[in-house]
């Protein structure tokens, strides 16, 4: 059971996209990375080929390391920024559940 899962809302802690938040689209455990919607946008230039007669510029979300991400305890509003939190685990009724360390509530 991972601390960050698909469809979780996360915030970026460091780098060019610091402070941005988005939903996790995909996890890549081998690289310890995740693809987050709207974060770490890269552009790729494709050369013209037989299939594609004109070249094109493609934008896509590149993977970002999990160490640069934190789960969002409370979503951002106009007045307050998002509150990042660490994740802990607790066993209730013989089930392991994730707990937000800042709020103490189940995720």
Swiss-Prot record:
Biological process (GO) annotations held by this record are:
translation
Whether DNA-binding counts among this entry's keywords is no
Q: Which GO terms describe its molecular function?
A: rRNA binding; structural constituent of ribosome
Q: Which GO terms describe its cellular component?
A: ribonucleoprotein complex; ribosome
Q: Which CDD domains match?
A: KOW_RPL26 (cd06089)
For this UniProt record, give its keywords in alphabetical order, as a comma-separated list: Ribonucleoprotein, Ribosomal protein, RNA-binding, rRNA-binding
Q: Which InterPro entries match?
A: KOW, Rib_uL2_dom2, Ribosomal_uL24, Ribosomal_uL24_CS, Ribosomal_uL24_KOW, Translation_prot_SH3-like_sf
Q: Which Pfam families match?
A: KOW, ribosomal_L24
The subunit field of the Swiss-Prot or TrEMBL record says:
Part of the 50S ribosomal subunit.
Q: Which family does it belong to?
A: Belongs to the universal ribosomal protein uL24 family.
Q: Which NCBIfam families match?
A: rplX_bact (TIGR01079)
Its biological purpose is as follows: One of two assembly initiator proteins, it binds directly to the 5'-end of the 23S rRNA, where it nucleates assembly of the 50S subunit.
**Can you name this protein?**
Large ribosomal subunit protein uL24
Per the UniProt record, the source organism is: Mesomycoplasma hyopneumoniae (strain J / ATCC 25934 / NCTC 10110)
Q: Which gene encodes it?
A: rplX
């Amino acid at each position: 059971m991972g601390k960050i899962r698909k469809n979780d809302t996360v915030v970026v802690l460091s780098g060019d996209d610091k402070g941005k938040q988005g939903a996790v689209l995909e996890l890549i455990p081998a690289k310890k990375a995740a693809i987050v919607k709207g974060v770490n946008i890269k552009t790729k230039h494709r050369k013209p080929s037989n299939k594609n007669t004109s070249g094109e510029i493609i934008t896509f979300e590149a993977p970002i390391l999990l160490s640069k991400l934190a789960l969002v305890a409370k979503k951002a509003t106009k007045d307050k920024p998002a509150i990042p939190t660490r994740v802990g685990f607790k066993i209730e009724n013989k089930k392991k559940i994730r707990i937000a360390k800042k709020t103490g509530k189940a995720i």
